[in-house]
A protein has these predicted regions:
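A beta-strand edge to alpha-helix "cap/lid" segment located at domain peripheries
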Residues: 1-27, 37-128
Length: 128
């Protein structure tokens, strides 16, 4: 039986994936907290859902984007806080191998809705 935390994360992943596949940066940014910290695929720290929107709007307009989440792990930290870790594989151009990264989110209830408050991706290739 799936937990409530797993169901919450599954719903966010579904919305996140749909907005990535459509290149809808504003819909994706709406999943983030107004207080979010965001480390994506470049070294900059983006803050708040406006910063997250700026990051997503600056990404290339890929020809056939798709994302797949695997190895999903969730852990409720409290009634209003969930940890998530997994692997995200980005298929950005048809025929090219995916870009796969480790991804973590901290998800919190904000104004009655679940929002991503911390987003971090890192290379699957060991750095050390």
């Amino acid at each position: 039986m799936r937990s409530a935390a797993a169901d919450t994360v599954s719903g966010i992943i579904e919305k996140w994936s749909a907005s990535f596949n459509k290149l809808d940066a504003d819909a994706r940014a709406s999943l983030y907290s107004k207080h979010a910290f965001f480390f994506g695929s470049n070294p900059s720290l983006y803050r708040g859902n406006e910063g997250v929107a700026a990051y997503f709007n600056a990404l290339p307009r890929w020809s056939s984007p798709a994302v797949q989440f695997n190895d999903v792990r969730t852990a409720p930290v409290g009634a209003d806080l969930i940890n998530f870790a997994g692997t995200a594989s980005f298929f950005i151009n048809e025929g090219e191998p995916p870009l796969s990264v480790k991804i973590t989110w901290v998800i919190a209830r904000e104004d009655g809705d679940w929002k991503i408050v911390s987003h971090h991706v890192s290379s699957k290739t060991p750095l050390i």
